[in-house]
Amino acid sequence: MATTTEKTPAAPGVVATESNQAVPAISLEKVSKTYRSGQVTTTAVESIDLEIRQGEFFSLLGPSGCGKTTTMRMIAGFEEPTSGVVRLSGKDVTGVPPNRRDVNMVFQSYALFPHMTVAENVAFGLKRKKVPAAEIRTRVAEMLELVELGDRAKYKPRQLSGGQQQRVALARALVNRPSALLLDEPLGALDLKLRQAMQLELKRIQREVGITFVYVTHDQSEALTMSDRIAVMNKGRIEQLGTPAQIYETPATRFVAGFIGTSNILTGTAQRVSDTLVRIDYGGDQHVLANTPQQMSDLGLVITVRPEKIRLGKDVPDANVSRIRGTVREVVYLGATTHYTVRTVDDTDIVVFQQNSSDASNLADHGDTVWLSWRPEHSYVLPG
């Protein structure tokens, strides 16, 4: 028997949904931002639609100038969209000033007050809101414990490391209990090891507080490490939206394949072998096999394969896998892995990441002729 769900009317200015849980923390509807200088108009963000869920760690990822920071600034209220609607928890906040939006921002510059202690820095926003002193002490203590700085409450910022200062800035933003926290490349000033440690720390904190984090970065490893979902941006548009695994394993465009991780791009004219399999022949006994949907054209395919999916060896692989012969042009030993660059007969360079096992017989040297092979499901077909 069919059932129906009773819907409660939404409050004025709030989008009606099946339940409060279904209301996105942040939504952008056909949002664009253009800048005009004289007769020149520059489009920073072009008609993007985006929903960020309650309680998720969401990253806006892309190269410099892709529009990710402008998008975040429109969410925060520091920039007003040229067109479109910005909603927070279903409420239209387009045109609402930043101080009236229930979001806080953390920047790469920590902006801590040097003359104040750690506790005073964290308490600053609460004091401006005239929160009772007893509540301030409780909330500040809770936040400092959360960021593991409870024993540093009386320290001045200059007495802290860069990572500790970043955690103070994070506590200062979270103590206000915003519905969402916006982070604009906050780890950019830290060294590599500290940055990697802080990535895990940020994810832990986000899980514990349970609020929405929106993270802007150009660093793919940061986005892949921390995010529940990622929007990859390019030239003011969202090229792909998905989980880290979806973005990495099944890139939607050639740009995403090249920007996220390392990809080998192969092109050619394909012939359909079966309903779900195509083959590109490279002469002789060399070919690439790829799984494809039935409706995809057989001509002019672009195929990507990740370096770690490829096996390198001296023996001819089986015919039921992709197999290409080439000459080793470069060998880079990196401890756990060795990276090979192999030049094929059509002068295409293919990069291979091979795990270094105790069996050294699989290793190849510069100038060696080798076979590369991978399974059909590891060849991902992109739009031509």
Swiss-Prot record:
Catalytic activity, as annotated: ATP + H2O + polyamine-[polyamine-binding protein]Side 1 = ADP + phosphate + polyamineSide 2 + [polyamine-binding protein]Side 1
State where ATP binds. 62-69
Calcium in keyword set = no
A Gene Ontology molecular function term for this protein is: ATP binding
Q: Which SUPFAM superfamilies match?
A: MOP-like, P-loop containing nucleoside triphosphate hydrolases
Keywords for this protein: ATP-binding, Cell membrane, Membrane, Nucleotide-binding, Translocase, Transport
Membrane topology of this protein: Peripheral membrane protein
Is Transit peptide one of the keywords?
A: no
User: What superkingdom does the record give?
Assistant: Bacteria
What GO cellular component term, any one, is given? Answer: ATP-binding cassette (ABC) transporter complex
What's its EC?
A: 7.6.2.11
Q: Which SMART domains match?
A: AAA
Localisation: Cell membrane
Identify the NCBIfam families for this entry. potA
| Family stated for the protein in its record | Belongs to the ABC transporter superfamily. Spermidine/putrescine importer (TC 3.A.1.11.1) family.
- Describe its partners and assembly state: The complex is composed of two ATP-binding proteins (PotA), two transmembrane proteins (PotB and PotC) and a solute-binding protein (PotD).
Stated name of the protein: Spermidine/putrescine import ATP-binding protein PotA
Question: Whose protein is this, by species?
Answer: Thermobifida fusca (strain YX)
